[in-house]
From Swiss-Prot:
Record's compositionally biased regions (Acidic residues): 258-269, 396-406
Ranges for region Triple-helical region: 559-1570
Main localization category: secreted
Impact after mutating residue 25 to P: In EDSCL1; not or less efficiently secreted into the extracellular matrix
Gene name as annotated: COL5A1
Annotated localization: Secreted, Extracellular space, Extracellular matrix
Protein name per its UniProtKB record: Collagen alpha-1(V) chain
Pro-piece positions: 1606-1838
Residues bearing PTM Sulfotyrosine: 234, 236, 240, 262-263, 338, 340, 346-347, 416-417, 420-421, 1601, 1604
Length: 1838
């Protein structure tokens, strides 16, 4: 035992007192009680010294400490720390003590309020907690639930989070808890716990927080101890955390294993990890020099060097003075003069001596007098904290002198000494351990007791400074002195007995609602595991331990789960979990690198005989296999080619002589081929020509076995004999050994197809072979399943312009366009029912074009228009997005073979397809070369082996003999050629694994597997070279309107087209003069409507036409006065074709329209006089294409208008089907050369398409080099006046431009002659009704007018009669591909092939049961072949025979019965990915678990999310030039040049013949400069076209090179940025700058986006009011907002001051629930309104945590009277009785048993009800009832 204290003997006992040796023996031997109070160091349990995540080392309480080299070590704890451990690690072998101390040295972050430590029971209820901060709380709840939360001890007026170090000691004793702060401030509180409280140690301890608390302890900590003794708290500053001028006791302060931190000398430095205190000393060690235990004690020798100091000095029994705050000096009073003097190096007194801590049973009311000499030292007596009473009156020192007996000591503390005192101890036993001068203690004669002297002044004794004088003579006994002055006040004693309970205090005010809990993550670390590629961690001790800890933690933390919480802070990486259940098959991964050759798998059971397979490629020679046992002799094979002469083998036993065979032809000497797998037994072949005499043949079956001869001596090898005839067929011998492979022979003829072999395991992927030559185009395969859409491809070259297609059905709503500048946003009106047709009003004055209004509601679809004349080719638009896949075109002619492409990467292995039909019989293969002869086995004992003769040729095949008895199983033979796939056989026994074969050459391409799962999009490939023109695409969607062009001059009136669909009513023109009635012209067929011309002057008012049939009901009411001119509305969609009314009155003569589509030449109409030029009206929307009109009367020529500005590019539409060829168009302007495209890969040459219609002859350009297309040139000079061109080909209707500014009103023209009716222009916007004009004279009957647009919604009219059924609509667009279906069932077998020649054998029967082995009969002579017998019952499988020739293909057998299930096969290929299940609700945060051990390496993770799009790849190599295609149609006209002066009118010339396609002309003059929209310099520099002059020269004419102007870069940059902006408008990214409207919208644009947080802007417009939401794409694209922190719920409590049936907002701690976005910002009302408008349904979860409280159904009564009620956002109350959209996902509270939870889901189409804003609780208020709740996010589904 270490000696850690020094004794100075200044005895107050009288010399000769006899009881001291027994007393000392008792005191020195008594094991102190604190052995049972070993401190439990929580910092060690939590592994602080290994610095887990969030823990770092820092300087502790003392920056310098006496006798230490460096400062104290503490640990800094940050928010990232997540530390927990099972409580049993603190108390592994005992229960948690009833009375205990918590000791800690800590510096909390200033202003923080968090729990330092929390202990939970197995159910997850907190039992003990210490909260640091202002007014710290000691949380304690025993097994009975006492005290309640309102009775937790609260230490007011104390601030533990002031940023300073504090030494905190908490003593829990009986029903009191005492907090001792910094060794001086002591506060005791009542702890209302049960008499025998129990703390469950089956839970966990959590450091630094509470489960679900958001507050986390932050600061520095040096010590955290639990001591199973309540008295330890009073000694904290002496024994555990002394002041800085005191050496550290033999205890590490925070379990730091660094030996240099505290102790720097001795053998055992740094070894103490648990506190070990020397509570008693061994008597044998007394007086000896101390032995160092954990560190040396240099001053220990002083203990034996004080012999002269032992003279008793009674006056020195006064205590040493107290030093402030226990500053490292012990104020110990010894009994007599045994004073405790602390060593300089060690400071390890016994912390809890029973004499020091007497409970005061003898005299509890006496004041404490430390100097009264009433204390008896045990190893050291510490009175600085003692609470001992003084002896009772009359029992002072005299009593001690005479009665210092064993009984006296016992009486001082009966509870303590009895168990330890040994009555057998004798004084003699103490001798060896006492100091040398111990006899002086007993010398002298006791005189009478003197008076007690005055109390002396306290001595100031510093350690090591005490100088002792010589002992003085003993004075006479004095009279009893007067009472001494009151000694210094002792430190506060232990708490006394529990007093009577005080009156209950007033209930405290409810605290503020706690913040929502964070999601605690189990901080497991995942360590390394098995080798890469292993399936998962092997089950290990670590894993089972982790499972046990997890299970324990789950039990410890099982509590009511909350609703979906916010994502918690990521925890540290934890250890791996236990192996999970096997997951769903993952997606097929990409082709991995070639793996290491795996071990051979076990052989499967033999399968049924399969069908014959096609010939496999000749394999490489196999390795030599082990020698097999001898098999039975097989049947003789067909004669083989002559082999090389073999080496002489060991002599075998002589066989019976064979018959001489005829000599056969010599075969070619070939190398040995690989033996094949056994094929099916073939037919008997024709007898071959006689072979040359062979060597002795194998034993035949014909002869009877001869008598066994004696073993002869071994003969010398004889010369090779003549080749004999093949011997008779012998019994099958044992299988011979496989010989070494021979040299490779010439390739044989293809053999007959063998039966298909069993499916082998998939081989390792071979290296990629060189790319093969591209094969010719095969016949089209069957339609495969629709694949997933591929990644967006590079834009293809412009295809041949097709003819105008028929009008498609209404497309899906496009993305919202730019928000228009003009127009007030009108409310969207519903489409009213059509009113009755009103009378035609007079034409009013033309109104000015108003600004475009917002788009109106969609009108009903119009009838399908007739096919119109093809329009003129439009200008090339900007590159649009790739159109959807068109319908497949007609196959063209076969193209030439393309160049060799680069090999593609192997695709993922497809699923196994169904078994195909059985193939026809293949050609007969050549007979394989016989293998080497095996060693002869002897049926009898082997004779001397003879020399091996040369191999003879194989004889002809004999007839099959009778089936022999089954022989012993042979060893595995070499693998044969692969046969065709056989039917699945019965499971064979597992054979030994064969050696791996070499990789064979690449086999033929297999059948196309089913479509694999959609892969992640690869990086975009390099653009391919321009392929052949593709088929015409569908018509593109309508582009955005271009900027308003300048008003054009009037064109000549077009031919009258057919009436178009009814357009919007045009503006009412001003009243015109009445014109003369013109003679009615011959009615021409209606032409297609031309573009709207300028409005003409008002014509005369015609007479009213005959009443038309009843039109759709119009707005009722009288005609109003003229209203103010409204803004021009946008073009509506085409309306339904209304019935054609009777001709109305003739309208005013319209202005000449622009050139209409050219109709076929009709009869000339009467020429009208030229009309006055009218005002230019705004162009109306283009009507649907009308049918090709018959030639109408020709109109008068109008003035050509000025050219308008070019509109914005529209998106490229899907190309429509090819139209009819139009007449040749005019020669277009030479287009500007475009920029050179990137070189694309050579496409496969497509089939030759049909030649396009002949285009008009283009101008012959100067033969230039095929240079890269240049940028648009600058504006050129106006050209000379050209002659009038020929009528051009009708182009597709152009995009409607925005309304141009109204032109100046023209002068009223003279009255013109009555002209022919002009073509109906597109309807203009509805103008205000004009005043009634004077009634005109009847005009000619006009053509039926265009149908007007739907009028403004009027009051509902009477229901009209039902209309006729409309024409069937056109087929819709191709839907998006559906998911890949499961593999279909096996198809039926193909058609049966032509019958083959009848085979001699029937088809193989089913495998029969194994027959009994028959007795072996003597082999008979081979008989003649008999007639074919009926198939016998199947015998047992014989041994493998020599492969026979392949037989004819038999008919397919009927399927056999299902075999027994085989053993588990290897894992199948991954199945198709299942449909995504609906995303579950976000789970409630789990409780914190324990840190487990690191696990094995986990399985390879799933494929990650697609990476960002890669940059464009390098330009590909030039492909092989394809064959020239047919001459394409003319390209589109170039960009328009500046308008030239008006040319003279030319006459129409005849159509010329189609010219050859000319070479590209020189670049046209530059076009007008466009507006520069903030060019992006990066893009500008990126889009700079650098043209290498050498390229141009290489290509030919260099003079075509045009130097770009500097401004072109800006134009290209602007175009590029515009393109990006438009792309982002169409496909928002969900960022703050580019938000989507809803998550559903985002999912539609980006189906691959993962769940997460994205920005949305439901009201669109400026994105500054966008907000971040959680997008749950897994659940279909729902948009989720979250309750704010204070609305997330409330902790479970009893709510004593609240009334049932009240709303939560009425609670004292309640409020209305409010919601925020994912960044915590409130969501605006307008945005929520729009979000609801964009949503079809919404859902939200509420979790109710209960303790004996009902949330929904009351299971006892079956009623819902106490169900929660919710207040929706629309102030609607919702509960079980009035809302069917609420359902309970979990209703654990219905039973009212213990802690449970109920999860309610509100999933409603009434989106205005969600989110909920208040909750009414109805079942609480009783003493045992508690509840809490959590509110989940509100998610809206579009």
């Amino acid at each position: 035992m270490d000696v850690h204290t020094r004794w100075k003997a200044r005895s107050a006992l009288r010399p000769g007192a006899p009881l001291l040796p027994p007393l000392l023996l008792l005191l020195l031997w008594a094991p102190p009680p604190s052995r049972a109070a070993q401190p439990a160091d929580l910092l060690k349990v939590l592994d602080f010294h290994n610095l887990p995540d969030g823990i770092t080392k820092t300087t502790g309480f003392c920056a310098t400490r006496r006798s230490s080299k460096g400062p104290d070590v503490a640990y800094r704890v940050t928010k990232d720390a997540q530390l927990s451990a099972p409580t049993k690690q603190l108390y592994p072998a005992s229960a948690f003590p009833e009375d205990f101390s918590i000791l800690t040295t800590v510096k909390a972050k200033k202003g923080s309020q968090a729990f330092l430590v929390s202990i939970y029971n197995e159910q997850g209820i907190q039992q003990i907690g210490l909260e640091l901060g202002r007014s710290p709380v000691f949380l304690y709840e025993d097994h009975t639930g006492k005290p309640g939360p309102e009775d937790y001890p609260l230490f007011r007026g104390i601030n533990l989070s002031d940023g300073k170090w504090h030494r905190i000691a908490l003593s829990v004793h009986k029903k009191n808890v005492t907090l001792i702060l910094d060794c001086k401030k002591k506060t005791t509180k009542f702890l209302d716990r049960s008499d025998h409280p129990m703390i469950d140690i089956n839970g966990i301890i959590v450091f630094g927080t509470r489960i679900l608390d958001e507050e986390v302890f932050e600061g520095d900590i040096q010590q955290l101890l639990f001591v199973s003794d309540h008295r330890a708290a009073y000694d904290y500053c002496e024994h555990y955390s002394p002041d800085c001028d005191t050496a550290v006791p033999d205890t590490p302060q925070s379990q730091d294993p660094n030996p240099d931190e505290y102790y720097t000398e001795g053998d055992g430095e740094g070894e103490t990890y648990y506190y070990e205190y020397p509570y008693y000393e061994d008597p044998e060690d007394l007086g000896k020099e101390p032995t160092p235990s954990k560190k040396p004690v240099e001053a220990a020798k002083e203990t034996t060097e004080v012999p002269e100091e032992l003279t008793p000095t009674p006056t020195e029994a006064a205590p040493m003075p107290e030093t402030s705050e226990g500053a490292g000096k012990e104020e110990d009073v010894g009994i007599g003069d045994y004073d405790y003097v602390p060593s300089e190096d060690y400071y390890t007194p016994s912390p809890y001596d029973d004499l020091t801590y007497g409970e005061g049973e003898e005299n509890p009311d006496q004041p404490t007098d430390p100097g009264a000499g009433a204390e008896i030292p045990t190893s050291t007596a510490d009175t600085s904290n003692s609470s001992n009473p003084a002896p009772p009156p009359g029992e002072g020192a005299d009593d001690l002198e005479g009665e210092f007996t064993e009984e006296t000591i016992r009486n001082l503390d009966e509870n303590y000494y009895d168990p330890y005192y040994d009555p057998t101890s004798s004084p003699s036993e103490i001798g060896p351990g006492m100091p040398a001068n111990q006899d002086t203690i007993y010398e002298g004669i006791g005189g009478p007791r003197g008076e007690k002297g005055q109390k002396g002044e306290p001595a100031i004794i510093e350690p090591g400074m005490l100088i002792e004088g010589p002992p003085g003579p003993e004075g006479p006994a004095g009279l009893p002195g007067p009472p001494g002055t009151m000694g210094p006040t002792g430190q506060v004693g232990d708490p006394g007995e529990r007093g009577p309970p005080g009156r209950p205090g007033l209930p405290g005010a409810d605290g503020l609602p706690g913040p929502p809990g964070t999601m605690l993550m189990l901080p497991f670390r995942f360590g390394g595991g098995g080798d890469a590629g292993s399936k998962g961690p092997m089950v290990s001790a670590q894993e089972s331990q982790a499972q046990a800890i997890l299970q324990q933690a789950r039990l410890a933390l099982r509590g009511p789960a909350g609703p979906m919480g916010l994502t918690g802070r990521p925890g540290p990486v934890g250890p791996p979990g236990s192996g999970g259940l096997k997951g769903e098959p993952g997606d097929v991964g990409p082709q991995g690198p070639r793996g290491v050759q795996g071990p051979p798998g076990p052989a499967g059971k033999p399968g049924r005989r399969g069908r014959a397979g096609s010939d496999g490629a000749r394999g490489m020679p196999g390795q030599t296999g082990p020698k097999g046992d001898r098999g039975f002799d097989g049947l003789a094979g067909l004669p083989g080619e002559k082999g090389h002469r073999g080496d002489p083998g060991p002599s075998g036993p002589p066989g019976p002589p064979g018959d001489d065979g005829e000599r056969g032809d010599d075969g070619e000497v070939g190398p040995r081929g690989l033996p094949g797998e056994p094929g099916p037994r073939g037919l008997l072949g024709p007898k071959g020509p006689p072979g040359p005499p062979g060597p002795p043949g194998v034993t035949g079956m014909d002869g009877q076995p001869g008598p066994k001869g004696n073993v002869g001596p071994q003969g010398e090898p004889g010369p090779p004999g003549q080749q004999g005839n093949p011997g008779a067929q012998g019994l099958p011998g044992p299988q011979g050994a496989i010989g070494p492979p021979g040299e490779k022979g010439p390739l044989g003829k293809p053999g007959l197809p063998g039966m298909p072999g069993a499916d082998g395991p998939p081989g390792h992927p071979g290296k990629e072979g060189p790319p093969g030559e591209k094969g010719g185009q095969g016949p089209p395969g069957p339609q495969g399943p629709i694949g997933y859409p591929g990644p967006r491809g590079v834009k293809g070259a412009d295809g041949i312009r097709g003819l105008k297609g028929t009008k498609g059905e209404k497309g899906e709503d496009g993305f919202p366009g730019f928000k228009g500048d003009m127009g007030i946003k009108g409310d969207r009106g519903e489409i009213g029912p059509p009113g009755p047709r009103g009378e035609d009003g007079p034409e009013g004055p033309k109104g000015r074009g108003g600004p475009n209004g917002d788009p109106g509601p969609l009108g009903p679809p119009g009838e399908k228009g007739k096919l119109g004349v093809p329009g003129l080719p439009g200008y090339p638009g900007r590159q649009g997005p790739k159109g959807s896949i068109g319908f497949p075109g007609f196959p063209g002619a076969n193209g030439e073979k393309g160049g060799r492409g680069t090999p593609g990467k192997p695709g993922p292995r497809g699923q196994r397809g169904p078994t195909g039909p059985r193939g026809e019989r293949g050609p007969r293969g050549i007979t394989g070369k016989p293998g080497p002869k095996g060693n002869s086995g002897g049926d009898g004992p082997a004779g001397p082996p003879g020399e091996r003769g040369p191999n003879g040729p194989q004889g002809p095949t004999g007839f099959p003999g009778p089936k022999g008895p089954p022989g012993p199983p042979g060893k595995d033979g070499l693998p044969g050629h692969p046969g065709q796939r056989g039917e699945t056989g019965f499971q064979g026994k597992t054979g030994p694994p064969g050696p791996p074969g070499v990789v064979g050459p690449q086999g033929p391409t297999g059948e196309t597997g089913p479509m694999g799962e959609r892969g992640h999009p690869g990086p975009p490939g390099p653009p391919g070279e321009q392929g052949l023109p593709g088929l015409a695409g569908k018509e593109g969607t309508k582009g955005d309107p271009g900027p308003a062009g300048l008003p054009g001059k009037d064109g000549p009136p077009g031919l009258r087209g057919f009436p178009g669909d009814r357009g919007l009513p045009g503006p009412v023109g001003a009243l015109g003069l009445k014109g003369n009635e013109g003679p009615p012209g011959p009615p021409g067929p209606a032409g297609s409507p031309g573009e709207r011309g300028p409005a003409g002057a008002a014509g005369p008012i015609g007479i009213p036409g005959r009443p038309g049939p009843q039109g759709p009901p119009g707005p009722a009411g009288e005609k109003g006065a003229p209203g103010e001119k409204g803004p021009q509305g946008p073009a509506g969609r085409d309306g339904l074709q209304g019935p054609v009314g009777l001709p109305g009155p003739a309208g005013p003569v319209g202005p000449p329209g622009e050139d209409g589509d050219k109709g076929e030449i009709g009869e000339p109409g009467q020429k009208g006089s030229k009309g006055d030029k009218g005002e230019q009206g705004p162009p109306g929307p283009t009507g649907p294409q009308g049918p090709i009109g018959q030639p109408g009367p020709s109109g008068a020529d109008g003035e050509p208008g000025p050219r308008g500005q070019q509109g914005l590019f529209g998106q490229k539409g899907d190309e429509g089907p090819r139209g009819f060829p139009g007449p040749p168009g005019p020669v277009g302007l030479q287009g500007l050369p475009g920029p050179p495209g990137e070189k694309g890969e050579t496409g496969d040459v497509g089939q030759m398409g049909p030649p396009g219609p002949p285009g008009p002859r283009g101008p012959s350009g100067a033969p230039g080099a095929d240079g890269p297309q240049g940028p648009p040139g600058g504006i050129g000079n106006p050209g000379a006046v050209g002659e009038k061109g020929e009528p051009g080909e009708a182009g597709e209707p152009g995009l409607p431009g925005e309304g141009g500014p109204p032109g100046p009103k023209g002068e009223r023209g003279e009255k013109g002659e009555s002209g022919p009716s002009g073509a109906a222009g597109p309807p203009g916007p509805k103008g205000p009704p004009g005043d009634d004009g004077p009634k005109g004279s009847p005009g000619p009957v006009g053509f039926p007018g265009d149908p007007g647009p739907p009028g403004e919604p009027g009051p509902a009219g009477q229901d009209g009669p039902p209309g006729d059924k409309g024409d069937d609509g056109e087929p819709g667009q191709t839907g998006s591909p559906g998911p890949t279906g499961e593999p279909g069932p096996s198809g039926p077998p193909g058609k049966r092939g032509p019958p083959g020649p009848a085979g001699p054998e029937g088809r193989q029967g089913e495998k029969g049961a194994k027959g009994e082995a028959g007795l072996e009969g003597p082999p008979g002579k081979t008989g003649p072949i008999g007639p074919q017998g009926a198939p016998g019952k199947p015998g047992p499988d014989g041994l493998r025979g020599i492969p026979g020739p392949v037989g004819e293909q038999g008919l397919p057998g009927s399927p056999g019965p299902d075999g027994p299930p085989g053993p588990m096969g290897p894992p199948g290929l991954p199945g198709l990915k299942g449909d995504s299940g609906p995303k579950g609700e976000k789970g409630h945060p789990g409780l914190i678990g324990l840190i487990g051990p690191p696990g094995e390496q986990g399985e390879k993770g799933d494929r990650g999310l697609p990476g960002p799009q890669g940059s464009s790849g390098p330009k590909g190599e030039q492909g092989i030039t394809g064959p020239s295609g047919p001459i394409g149609p003319p390209g589109p006209p170039g960009l328009p040049g500046p308008p030239g002066p008006k040319g003279a009118k030319g006459s129409s010339g005849p159509t010329g013949p189609k010219g050859e396609a000319g070479h590209p002309g020189p670049p046209g003059p530059p076009g007008p400069p466009g507006e520069v929209i903030q060019p992006l310099p990066i893009q500008a520099s990126r889009t700079r076209r650098n043209i290498d002059a050498s390229q141009l020269l290489d290509d030919g004419n260099g003079e075509n090179y045009v130097d770009y102007a500097d401004g072109m870069e800006e134009i290209f940059g602007s175009l590029n940025s515009l393109k990006l902006e438009i792309e982002q408008m169409k496909r928002p990214l969900g960022t703050q700058q580019n938000p989507a409207r809803t998550c559903k919208d985002l999912q539609l644009c980006h189906p691959d986006f993962p769940d997460g947080e994205y920005w949305v802007d439901p009201n669109q417009g400026c994105s500054r009011d966008s907000f971040k939401v959680y997008c749950n794409f897994t659940a279909g694209g729902s948009t989720c907002v979250f309750p704010d922190k204070k609305s997330e719920g409330a902790r479970i409590t009893s709510w004593p001051k609240e009334n049932p049936g009240s709303w939560f907002s009425e609670f004292k701690r309640g409020k209305l629930l409010s919601y925020v976005d994912a960044e915590g910002n409130p969501v605006g009302v307008v945005q929520m309104t729009f979000l609801r408008l964009l949503s079809a349904s919404a859902h939200q979860n509420v979790t109710y945590h209960c303790y004996q409280s009902v949330a929904w159904q009351d299971a006892a009564t079956g009623s819902y009277d106490k169900a929660l009620r919710f207040l929706g956002s629309n102030d609607e109350e919702m509960s079980y009785d009035n809302n069917p959209y609420i359902r309970a996902l979990v209703d654990g509270c219905a039973t009212k048993k213990g802690y449970q939870k109920t999860v309610l889901e509100i999933d409603t189409p009434k989106v205005e009800q969600v989110p909920i804003v208040d909750i009414m609780f109805n079942d609480f208020g009783e003493a045992s009832q508690k509840f809490g709740f959590e509110v989940g996010p509100a998610c809206f589904m579009g």
